[in-house]
Amino acid sequence: MKKQEITLTYDFICPWCWIAERRLARVVDDLGLADAVDARIVPYELNPAMPVEGMDRNAYRTAKFGSWARSQAMDAHVAEAGRAEGLQFHYAIVDRTPNTLLAHRLVWFAQRNGNASGLVDALFGAYFRDGRDIGDAAVLIDIAAEAGLDADAVTAFLASDEGTTEIRALEAEAIRQGIGSVPSMQIGQTVITGAQPDAVFRDAFADAVGALAIIE
């Protein structure tokens, strides 16, 4: 049977992307589709103008949301939603808002080499659970190695500009397709925006599998 293609548009500083990724993975497992789907990660930088070195998270979030207290309230809401999915958000140790271009390039590299499995979740966990700076190349090399990628190959890749043009093109195409926020997931002909309940993913897979059966 032909594999069901799914497109996942994420940014690795988006907490709802991690929550959506966990819900989607659970549904895929529950439906026994782990070997029947072909997932493609599409990059989307929420902060494309972020300095390469990132910013102090307190300063950035205070400026963005008007106060640190408001930012903390939003973080608490996310952490509660994450706990329901078995995810740990340790915002107290997250002190940087990183530029995520390097992280997106790393995933692009891993997908090209057929070894992106586990890397996406590892990046989310490194940032939200462990407070690691995923805008730092040395940190990304460690995360990649922990996820099973060759550290020397990743080091050479991140030291180059390879993939940057492709990332920009993928982001531009996503915007042309009407994607204005993340997470955004396409399963068959169904586009799902936001961290929706499991039932929404189940319905999308039911529609997509039914369409594939008709085609075949």
Question: Where would I find each of the regions flagged by the language model?
Answer:
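C-terminal cap of thioredoxin/glutaredoxin-like
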Residues: K2, I6-I13, I19-V37, I41, ...
